[in-house]
Regions:
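Short helix-capping/linker turns of helical repeat alpha-solenoids
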Residues: 50-51, 64-67, 80-82, 87, ...
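Hydrophobic face of amphipathic alpha-helices that form TPR/SEL1-like repeat modules
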Residues: 39-46, 58-62, 73-80, 109-116, ...
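Bacterial N-terminal signal peptides that target proteins for export
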Residues: 6-23
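Sec/Tat signal peptide C-region and signal peptidase I cleavage site
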Residues: 33-37
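TPR/TPR-like alpha-solenoid signature
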Residues: 40, 72, 93, 108, ...
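Terminal, low-structured helical/coil segments at or just beyond the last alpha-helical repeat
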Residues: 141-165
């Protein structure tokens, strides 16, 4: 009987300790998410106002920490020369990071870069692969773009793209 009381006491203490840890972890996550949202919102507000230098300053740390939305937005800035000198290779870098995390718009832009040879060697196989992935991720334009591209590809290239996708 004494063992059961001791076990109940230990269990309550362990549960209490676990709840405290979970509460602290939740607070940490919420505070980080709040800080992310504030920084991202500052960048978005700046971008909408045409202040792309500030947008870059707000989004770059988020992008470097792995945020796919910020990575995509940095890709757009470099792709279009907004707040930075236009740099297609840098745009491809950021699109690739976001695309690998499933960001359909980044996948679509990356496919376009491969199709046109912007920032990368022109490669219809990789353009096909990325438009295929973007279509699977929900991009409405990707399938149409891929269908247009297929008309310019050999049967061997189409087969290779399908095998690699």
């Amino acid at each position: 009987m004494g063992v059961l009381i001791w076990f109940r006491h230990i269990s309550k203490a362990a549960i209490s300790h676990t709840i405290k840890k979970l509460t602290l972890a939740t607070l940490l996550i919420v505070s980080c998410a709040t800080a992310w949202a504030a920084d991202f919102a500052k960048g978005l507000t700046a971008s909408r106002a045409g202040d792309f230098v500030t947008a870059l300053a707000e989004w770059k740390p988020l992008a470097e920490q792995g945020d796919a939305i910020a990575q995509f937005d940095l890709g757009l800035l470099y792709d279009n020369g907004k707040g930075v000198i236009e740099d297609d290779k840098e745009a491809v870098k950021w699109y690739m990071l976001a695309a690998e995390q499933g960001k359909a718009s980044a996948q679509t832009n990356l496919a376009f870069m491969h199709a046109t040879g912007q920032g990368v060697i022109q490669d219809n196989v990789y353009a096909h692969i990325w438009w295929n992935i973007a279509a699977a991720s929900g991009s409405e334009n990707a399938k149409g773009n891929k269908d247009i591209l297929v008309k310019q590809m050999t049967a061997q290239d189409i087969s290779k793209a399908q095998d690699l996708a």
